[in-house]
Regions:
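Alpha-helical transmembrane segments of multi-pass inner-membrane proteins
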Residues: 27-32, 46-49, 77, 81-82, ...
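Membrane helix-loop boundary segments at the extracytoplasmic
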Residues: 31-41, 330-333, 364-403
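Membrane-interface helix caps and helix-loop-helix hairpins in membrane proteins
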Residues: 85-94, 212-213, 381-386
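Membrane-interface micro-motifs in multi-pass membrane enzymes
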Residues: 37-46, 95-96, 167-182, 322, ...
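A membrane-periplasm/extracellular boundary helix in multi-pass inner-membrane enzymes
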Residues: 135, 139-144, 231-272, 278-289, ...
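Long extracytoplasmic/lumenal interhelical loops at the membrane interface
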Residues: 267-281, 293-333
Length: 426
């Protein structure tokens, strides 16, 4: 009879040999594998992994690896703290300050995912969990749609825009953003990794279906751009087929989804687009009034009315953030913080691009990071996805992974567990 340890022996064999490093790596792996299932569990495992890794650093003095983004990251954290300190209500910025701890994911990924095989196992676990979340979300869509057909048969589209599927995440934007990043990585895996089993195409179909049913246009845009990039990396000559496939897909889609796509060209008649235009105008006025440190993290909703034109009543909706990463950071934390964030994002992309050009095996990991970066950045023009912990955690993990395959191929794995340089197959 197969024991629990035998079942997970391939995973255990990838952990470091040093005691506290082994514990830290196992706990961090559990954190990564709960990103899509439970935010509370993922952050609890992350905290325990960071504690175990700190003990490992103190006892064993290992070499520490980190992506080359220290300067922009330090400046981003500094300006966030300064903006919070100088805000009209500093207490409202506590959440943004605490969220800076999530950047430890960059450190822990680079040092506790010890080999290309370890990374492959984590990614495959994430792909399966994404499919599970997709199945749950598809069931949620069926329940919601059936209810709306019974209660509001003439306004199904309208109510679907306000009652979307959240998967395990409690909110559709968190679910959609996570699925988008996993989708980009899974497409990279299928197109660019060697010897991939057909089973993973079924997984992709489930994930893609959940993204379509998520009904979120920014997520659709991010996925579309990621696919364009990855097909360009895989078979550039096939790019001309995309417009044809898009047209066929649009014509074959149910009327609800056709209407969702058409609404992009009708911003004044779509409440979610109309409120974004109002928010972006308000954000611009905030930046002009407070260019250096902004109005303060968590303070936008409190001062929102002050930046509307005289006598204008705000559109009813969610006003805690501005549905745009660039405007959000500029208005909330000031232009210096925004500049440091743009530097940080550019450094993450440039680092992945350089690794992409150096590595020969497991190149799909670097391409997944670049595709995920494009999807995340473009979706962030219509949603404040950098400010949502569930999506940010997945993004930081994705952007840390190219360093692992670079170290694996150059033989720079942890001394207590040399990283494998073999290609990752599936």
């Amino acid at each position: 009879m197969t024991s629990f340890r035998d079942l997970f022996k391939p995973a255990f064999s990838e952990l470091p040999t040093a005691t506290y490093a082994r514990w830290a790596s196992a706990l961090f792996s559990l954190s990564v594998l709960t990103f899509l299932l439970s935010l509370a569990a993922a952050q609890a495992f992350l905290a325990l992994a960071a504690l175990a890794y700190a003990v490992h650093l103190w006892r064993d003095r290992p070499a520490v690896h980190f992506p080359p983004i220290k300067a922009p990251l330090a400046l981003f954290c500094l300006f966030t703290l300064l903006s919070t300190w100088k805000a009209a209500n500093p207490g409202a910025g506590g959440f943004a300050v605490r969220k800076l701890v999530l950047f430890t994911i960059l450190l822990l990924t680079a040092n506790l995912v010890t080999s290309a095989r370890h990374l492959k196992l984590l990614w495959q676990g994430i792909f399966l969990e994404s499919a599970l979340a997709g199945l749950v979300a598809s069931g949620q869509f069926a329940v919601i749609y059936r209810h709306l057909r019974a209660v509001h048969p003439d306004r199904i589209y309208y109510y679907l825009t306000f009652e979307r599927i959240p998967g395990f995440m409690g909110h559709w934007m968190n679910f959609g953003g996570q699925q988008m990043l996993v989708f980009a990585a899974l497409v990279a895996f299928l197109l660019l990794a060697p010897r991939v089993k057909k089973f993973w195409w079924v997984v992709l179909a489930i994930v893609a279906l959940s993204i379509v049913l998520n009904f979120t246009r920014g997520v659709w845009l991010g996925c579309f751009v990621a696919v364009i990039y990855l097909i360009g990396c895989w078979r550039p000559r096939l790019l001309w087929l995309l417009p044809v496939l898009l047209l066929v897909g649009y014509l074959a889609a149910p009327s609800l989804f056709q209407q969702r796509l058409r609404s992009i060209g009708l911003p004044t008649s779509d409440p979610s687009l109309a409120i974004r235009f109002e928010m972006w105008q308000v954000g611009g006025r905030m930046v002009r009034a407070h260019p250096w440190l902004g109005v303060g993290p968590g303070n936008i909703e409190q001062v929102y009315l002050l930046y509307l034109p005289p006598g204008k009543v705000p559109i009813v909706g969610y006003h805690e953030h501005l549905h745009n990463n660039v405007l959000q950071l500029g208005a909330e934390r000031g232009l210096p913080c925004l500049a440091s964030w743009l530097w940080l994002m550019g450094a993450l992309a440039w680092h992945s691009w350089k690794i992409r050009r150096r590595i020969r095996q497991n190149r799909w990991v670097a391409e997944a990071a670049l595709a995920g970066w494009l999807a995340f950045f473009l979706e962030g023009l219509f949603e404040c996805n950098f400010g949502t912990s569930p999506v940010l955690m997945v993004f930081l993990f994705v952007m840390s992974t190219p360093l692992i395959v670079q170290r694996s191929e150059s033989g720079e794995g942890e001394a207590s567990h040399p990283a494998s340089s073999l290609p990752v197959s599936a």
